[in-house]
Amino acid sequence: MSFPKNFLWGAASAAYQIEGAYDEDGKVPGIWDALSRGHVKHGENGNIACDHYHRYKEDVALLKKLGVKAYRLSVSWPRVMSGPDTVNPKGLEFYSNLVDELKAAGIEPMVTIFHWNLPMWAYEKGGW
C-alpha cells in the first residue's frame, strides 16, 4: 500500500494522559482527576503522566527526530479555565509556547478543542 505524496504523517495525544503538573500554575481539578482515582490498575493517575508540561520542548524534539509532520493535541480546560469567568494566563501560555515550539520544528499543530477534559467546577454546574 502506498500513500499519496501529500499524506500528512502525524502523532496525537490527550492532555490528561501526558501533561502531568496536575496542581501547578493555576490548573484546577478536572473530571479525570476525580474519575481515575482508585479506578485504574496500580492506582495510576495523571498527576505526573509523561510530564509533558515540563518536558514539551524535549517531546517536540523527539517528534521532529521521528519525522512527524503534524501533531494533534488536546486542551486541558482545567488548565485554561480556573473558574466560570476566569482564564488562567499560565495555562494559555503553556499552549502558546507548545504551538510555537511545534511550528519552529516544522510540525503542524492540530488542536482538539474538547477531549473530555472538563473542569470539576463546570461538571458540578452540569457541564458547559
Description of each model-found segment:
Residues 1-66:
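N-terminal carbohydrate-binding accessory modules
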Residues 60-128:
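Substrate-binding cleft and catalytic face of glycoside hydrolase catalytic domains
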